[in-house]
Amino acid sequence: MLFRSLAPNINSYKRFQEGSFAPTTAAWGIDNRTAGFRLAGHGGSIRIECRVPGADVNPYLAFAGLIQAGLYGIENNLELEDPLMGNIYQNKKAKSVPGTLREAINLAKKSKLLPKIFQADVLEHYIHAAEWEQSEYDKSVNDWEHQRYFERG
């Protein structure tokens, strides 16, 4: 659910390609553009950039999810992992972001954190909506399939 608020559509996941400057990991770094979360600036101008969302994101939903997750971490004294340095695309310690909507759905269903930060009916609604969207996509025949299998003959 949290990741779906940052990457809401099937097409959202196609940007997460190594070397694309779209993050492929749920890591953070200091002034590191290969990180999903980047601590940037100095002194009074320091800020956190969430580099995961694309132009298709609902900013209200994304901010709500990020704020809820952050508050949960603060209230429960969760330990922040060390920042990753260098090219995070090649860092084997970094946790990968979901590569598809289907993967995001499966992670949301297994999550122990999401039920703690979202009401059950909200979480259920977003998972159901994502499953419906994935199901509709799975039934569609796209241009690649036409070109590959139909027009080839």
What kind of region is each of these model predictions?
Residues 7-95:
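C-terminal catalytic subdomain
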Residues 6, 13, 52-55, 83, ...:
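Aromatic-enriched hydrophobic runs in primary sequence
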